[in-house]
Amino acid sequence: MATRLLRTNFIRRSYRLPAFSPVGPPTVTASTAVVPEILSFGQQAPEPPLHHPKPTEQSHDGLDLSDQARLFSSIPTSDLLRSTAVLHAAAIGPMVDLGTWVMSSKLMDASVTRGMVLGLVKSTFYDHFCAGEDADAAAERVRSVYEATGLKGMLVYGVEHADDAVSCDDNMQQFIRTIEAAKSLPTSHFSSVVVKITAICPISLLKRVSDLLRWEYKSPNFKLSWKLKSFPVFSESSPLYHTNSEPEPLTAEEERELEAAHGRIQEICRKCQESNVPLLIDAEDTILQPAIDYMAYSSAIMFNADKDRPIVYNTIQAYLRDAGERLHLAVQNAEKENVPMGFKLVRGAYMSSEASLADSLGCKSPVHDTIQDTHSCYNDCMTFLMEKASNGSGFGVVLATHNADSGRLASRKASDLGIDKQNGKIEFAQLYGMSDALSFGLKRAGFNVSKYMPFGPVATAIPYLLRRAYENRGMMATGAHDRQLMRMELKRRLIAGIA
C-alpha cells in the first residue's frame, strides 16, 4: 500500500506546477535548487560550453553559427530587441521562481491582479514562446514565420493532461482542429502536428497499462487479452522497478476506457492520414512511457503500413540508458513488418523526478550518469537513424535538439551519406522562441528546420509556459551564445544606423 501511495503521489507531483509556500516568493539556495529539466522539443539535458567557430574558420559541415548578421538578417530590429530581453529574463532563475509562485498563489484569485498578470505575461513571454490563442491564430503565425524566415512550424495544442473522459474527448477535438489548421496551410509551411497521449487518455489508466506491460515482459506467460499488435517497448536494460508485484487485471470499466483512448488516437491518426499531415507523439517519464510507446507503435502499424513515408512518429529520449536498445528493437520490428516508421529524437526531460523516484525505491536512475553519456547516446541514435533514412527505406527522422555540436555532426553525416537535405526524410526542430541561431544556421545549410509552436488561450497556456520556463532554466543558462549573438547584432545595427 505504501508503495502504491508513493507512486500515486509521484504522478500527482509530476504533472503539477512546483508548489511553493503561499506566504511569500521562494528563496533560491544551493540546497533548494532544482535540477533543470527540458521539455517537449527542447527536451535535452543542460549542455556543456560549445566550440563556436570564428568567422574566418571554414567547416566542411556547412553550418555557420558565428555570423550574426547573416543568421538574424530576416529578423526586424524591434523583434530582435524583444527576443533578447525575454530570453535574458527567462535565464534568471529567481525571476522564473517568482513567476511560478505568483501564478500558484491567491493573487490569481482576484480579478484585478489576475488580469494584470495575464496581460503582462501575454505581451512578453506568451507572445514570444506561443503561437496564438487558437488553431487558426497559430496557423497564421506559422505562415508569417515561414514567409519571413523559411522555418516551418509544428503545431502543438498546449494541453498537458486530462483527468476524465469528457476532457479527453474535448482535447481530441482540439487536436482534430489543429490538423485541419495545418492542412489549410501550404505544405511548404508546416511539417507536422504534435499530440500528447496524456491529453487523450487519463494518466491513471496509462500507469495501469504500463504496469501490466512491464509484468508481461517479466512473465511471458502473463497474457493481456486487450493488447493490440505493437513493437517491443522494453529491452534488457529497461527499468522495471515501477512494478514489483503482479498488477490486478484491468477492470471492465478500465478496458472500456482503454478502448476509448485507442479510439481517440486512431481518430487523430485517421485525420492525419486523410490530410497527409505527419503526427508526432510526445514522450513522458518512465512510469507512463511503456503505455505511450505501446499506443504509438500500435497506431503506426495501423496507419503507416503500405505508405512510402510514415504518418505516425514516436519519440525516443536519449537520456535514458535503454534508449539505444529500444530504438534498435523498434527499427528491427518495423523492418520485419514492412512498416515505415518515424522517430523524433530528443535528449530528455524529467531528470530530477526520474532520479527521485528511483532513489525512493532504492533503484538506479534510468537516466545516464553523465551529460556526456547522454550526448553520446543522442549522437549514436542520430547516426543510426540517418543511415536508415539514407538507404531508401521508409524511415522518417526528426532531430529535435538545441545542441550545436549535434547539428554539426548531423550536417557532416548527411554530407558523408549523400542525403538530400530537402527530401523530407530528415529535419531538425527547436522550440519556438529559442535557439534561433541554430535554427537559422541549419536552414542556411540547406536543411528542413521547424519550430515547435504551442498554442492555446492565455489562461490555459500560462501553466504550460511557467513549467517550460521552470524546467528550461538549465538550457537558458547555456543559451548565452545565442543571447551574445543577438546583442552583437543589435550593436552592429545601432552603429550602422548612427553611421
Swiss-Prot record:
Catalytic activity, as annotated: L-proline + a quinone = (S)-1-pyrroline-5-carboxylate + a quinol + H(+)
EC code(s) of this entry: 1.5.5.2
Tissue note: Ubiquitous. Highest expression in pollen grains, in the stigma and in developing embryos.
Keyword vocabulary terms for this entry: FAD, Flavoprotein, Mitochondrion, Oxidoreductase, Proline metabolism, Stress response, Transit peptide
One Pfam family recorded for the sequence: Pro_dh
InterPro entries the UniProt entry points to: FAD-linked_oxidoreductase-like, Proline_DH_dom, Proline_oxidase
Gene Ontology biological process terms, A to Z: cellular response to hypoxia; defense response to bacterium; proline catabolic process to glutamate; response to oxidative stress; response to water deprivation
Name of the protein described by the UniProt record: Proline dehydrogenase 1, mitochondrial
Source organism per UniProt: Arabidopsis thaliana (Mouse-ear cress)
